[in-house]
Amino acid sequence: MDKRIFCFWLGNSPMSERRQQNLDRISQITKCEVTFITDDTISEYIKPDAPFHEGYQYLSGTTKCDYARAYFMHHYGGGYTDIKIIYYPWTLSFDELDDPSIWVVGYREINGGGVARLSPEKKELQEQLCKNWGYLLGNGAFICRPNTPFTREWMDELNKTMDEYLPELKKNPARDSRDCLGKDGVSMFPIPWAGIAGCIFHPLCMKYVDHLSYALYPPEFVDYL
């Protein structure tokens, strides 16, 4: 597999100077090729037999990135990172995929507070995720083998979730790049924070824990905006 990392900046929010500096350094530090995807270039990667969900157009910039990274990891594989400070090379982490039993390489969730908050009807699953948080991968950076049972189920669950949200998305499209359910106490955008990211990704990590590697260092989570 090519040692290529995808980064996304989607939506109409301008990138801050700090984010731009972080993006400029990712290739140098990771020792990997970086492909930067924007609204202007993303259509080049959408496969004719696998179009984006109808609801994509109504998403915020953040949730567009959540959707896109799942799509790219399934159809293309390779690395993904948030546009944050990276401290270490990724070359050895990519080498973990030399083992065919490894499907996803990432870093362990930092603490139990990083576990995605599922909907109330999934209380039992939520308890299991919180109990086993140390086995979950963080959402900020990872490397995926394409077209595995993990990524296939990821896309299936993502599109099913988007189907459920679609009627409300049409009524209440995102107001800004970081919109989420209840933002500022008034947002009617239907998707909660991590609603199409960790809420899908974390249960899959627990299901396919035997196919995970934890050989990636996390990005920096402070002072990145």
Can you name each region flagged by the protein language model?
Residues 1-66, 71, 81-225:
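Glycosyltransferase-associated regions of secretory-pathway enzymes
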Residues 76-79:
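Short acidic donor-binding loop at the edge of a beta-strand
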